[in-house]
Amino acid sequence: MKNEFLNFEQIDRATWQQLHRKTTIPLSQSELNSIKSFNDRIQLHEVSDIYLPLVNLIHIYRKARKDLNFTKSLFLQKTIKPQPFIIGVSGSVAVGKSTTSRLLQILIARTFKYAKVELVTTDGFLQPNAVLEERQLLNKKGFPESYDMEKLIDFLDKIKNGYDCQIPVYSHEIYDIIPNKTQEIKSPDFLIVEGINVFQNPQNQRLYVSDYFDLSIYVDADVEHIETWYLERFQKLLTLAKNDPNNYYHRFTQMTYPEILSIAQNTWKNINLANLEKFIEPTRNRADIILHKAENHEIDKIYLKK
């Protein structure tokens, strides 16, 4: 076991799935297919074996948070207004964070009756391409300096204190922030914040994004598997973009396969792998829960912080 996992309890899949009594899975395979990332693979048994026990654990964390807030209100002799339970989800590009986040959104909404569950991605807090070009950071897109972290922290602070917010929306099709389009977040009971950067050091070193999380999850996998998934995703993005000249990836569809593969491999090595090794993976041990995925995309190990 690596030293960084000394403060975690490792739980194998067989043990984990026994931690929740068998119940009816609250979604169908077609629903599951509609929410998964297009290069990801997930079946209903993964929901039953992994995610239903995870939602049960989320229930435990949320109850503990509510009990703590109630006790603090007695100590302070004042009422503490209800706050959303905020879950951070991090991990590498192409590891399956989005699938995990969207699945949790549905399962939580169907487990906690009448709960409003919102999901935001930190892609919306990327600087627009025009700003990145001006600062000569376009080739560093996804690295910490390409995000408006102050805006992200301001958003989380407002949400935690009961304010409604509007945040920018990012499009992978145009590879940029969509002008004049926002996502409104209004009084959620649960907020899931998904992104590669949610556990990273802030630029001002005074406040962490993760300071606002009630529970943090890191989706993990061996690097060689993530690389394979990334290259598969790149190829599928080109297939989707083939007949859409407005799609950012359309420009690559006119190239030969060796040229495309070379671009994808260089992007992985010089941007995504570098970002993973320097900024993302070092934050892994800040998570409360680490979900480790095997080559077949199924979660084979769970690490729970002691």
Swiss-Prot record:
Catalyzed reaction equations: (R)-pantothenate + ATP = (R)-4'-phosphopantothenate + ADP + H(+)
Any Gene Ontology CC annotation: cytoplasm
Residues annotated as binding ATP: G91, S92, V93, A94, V95, G96, K97, S98
A Gene Ontology molecular function term of the record: pantothenate kinase activity
Taxon lineage: Bacteria, Bacillati, Bacillota, Bacilli, Lactobacillales
Biological process per Gene Ontology, one example term: coenzyme A biosynthetic process
Gene: coaA
EC number: 2.7.1.33
Pathway this chain belongs to: Cofactor biosynthesis; coenzyme A biosynthesis; CoA from (R)-pantothenate: step 1/5
SUPFAM superfamilies cross-referenced by the UniProt entry: P-loop containing nucleoside triphosphate hydrolases
Entries under HAMAP family matching the protein: Pantothen_kinase_1
The protein, known as: Pantothenate kinase
Domain of life: Bacteria
Entry keyword set: ATP-binding, Coenzyme A biosynthesis, Cytoplasm, Kinase, Nucleotide-binding, Transferase
